[in-house]
């Protein structure tokens, strides 16, 4: 699952620090979530989906996180 999130982040051409910043997270907090040490909140999942929609209009939260 977490490699999918990293893959989508790479498709956005963003670093962990950049994507974390868009979510209101520090680089370390985002890194912990991407590596599965803590969970993304529902709000963060929605924000990531919204960032991906211009590139992948049909993407779902399930596609990204499950």
Please tell me what each predicted stretch does:
Residues 16-17, 34, 44:
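Acidic-residue sensor for enzyme active/binding pockets
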Residues 3-22:
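Short basic helix-loop element that most often maps to the first helix and adjoining turn
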Residues 43-59:
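DNA major-groove recognition helix of helix-turn-helix/homeodomain DNA-binding modules
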Residues 60-66:
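Short amphipathic recognition helices of helix-turn-helix/homeodomain-type DNA-binding modules
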Residues 4, 29-32, 63:
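Residue-level recognition of specific faces of alpha-helices
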Residues 25-40:
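Recognition helix of helix-turn-helix/homeodomain-like DNA-binding domains
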């Amino acid at each position: 699952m977490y490699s999918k999130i990293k893959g989508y982040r790479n498709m956005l051409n963003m670093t962990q620090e950049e994507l974390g910043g868009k979510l209101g997270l520090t680089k370390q907090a985002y890194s912990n979530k991407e590596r599965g040490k803590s969970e993304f909140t529902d709000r963060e999942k929605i924000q990531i989906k919204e960032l991906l929609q211009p590139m992948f209009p049909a993407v779902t939260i399930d596609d990204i996180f499950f």
